[in-house]
Amino acid sequence: MLKFKKRIMTEEVHLRINDNKGAFYIEVEGKQEAMMTFVFAGEDKVIIDHTEVNPGNEGKGFGKKMVTKAVEFAREKGIKIIPLCPFAKSVFDKTPEFRDVL
């Protein structure tokens, strides 16, 4: 009888900030599979301007995970989010508990 190890893939959201812009991104097995970019608008706001998920990863919840991480980041820093990205805006529209950071 053959035994197979079950492979567990983790989709942890990471944050990268460079000067006045940044990105939340997800790596799977060392490869970036999704990214959501933002820019700082002054000291108290960030503008989410783009969300992208690599082909084959659509529908896995990566986009919502990144928006959720952005909301946590905004709450920790006491800042607001302006979701210009249509995907991010749709998540905010569907998730009333995120609206405190708008």
Where are the predicted features?
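Short, Lys/Arg-enriched N-terminal segments with co-localized hydrophobic residues
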Residues: 1-9
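C-terminal structural segments of small proteins and small subunits
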Residues: 69-102
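Conserved acetyl-CoA pyrophosphate-binding loop and the N-cap/start of the following alpha-helix
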Residues: 57, 61-66
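Conserved beta-hairpin
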Residues: 22-33
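A conserved beta-strand-loop-helix scaffold within acyl/acetyltransferase catalytic domains
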Residues: 36-44
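Short loop/turn motifs at secondary-structure junctions and domain boundaries
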Residues: 15-17
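Conserved acetyl-CoA binding element of GNAT-fold acetyltransferases
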Residues: 45-54
